[in-house]
């Protein structure tokens, strides 16, 4: 696209807080400033394809089903929450601030940026896996209110907090281990939040999920153990549980 229609130009003028320009070589629209097209009943970006937006990009609370045409890079935050997205394909790959894709119908995080400067929020979706998550999140990672059964695919680094409340977690395999312990949120899962935090603390101390969970068998409820037991090999359950009584894994 080397030219824009009058409707596209009017739309860009209304939504851009700053200067927008069309690169005739790439056909991409760059914005020096913020772009806000939130809450306008949009199903897409009117055929416009964005390149770099130096400020924030708001397209939340619309009816958008695809991020095709979304910015390739956002210097500030990117908000696409409250839409009808089932995929993050087309999402910006560089985001300096927050990335919020909550309240959609996502079943996968494939296509998400691999580095997010501040917070990443994918709450209130239909995720069963975290595969595709950013590798690095500067502050908080929120994946609460989904359908996760484990944390496989979670970021390798999270600067502050990790919220996985109200999922279907029976395992912490894949958990990000460099977050602040007091900001690891895990209530509302089949395994009690207290038990998950205790397991997570041992994992942060260098133990695998299997060893950490098995060592706490005598300290958790029968209900929690019922969900965790299938993850623990039968051969190691008695020995690890006994050694746990003597504080070997403290």
Predicted region positions:
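Serine/proline-rich low-complexity intrinsically disordered segments, especially terminal tails, linkers
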Residues: 68, 79-80, 86-89, 101, ...
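LRR N-terminal entry segment and analogous cap-like coil->beta motifs
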Residues: 14-80, 95-97, 101, 117-118, ...
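Leucine-rich repeat domain C-terminal region
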Residues: 164, 177-213
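Canonical leucine-rich repeat
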Residues: 31, 45-48, 59, 67-70, ...
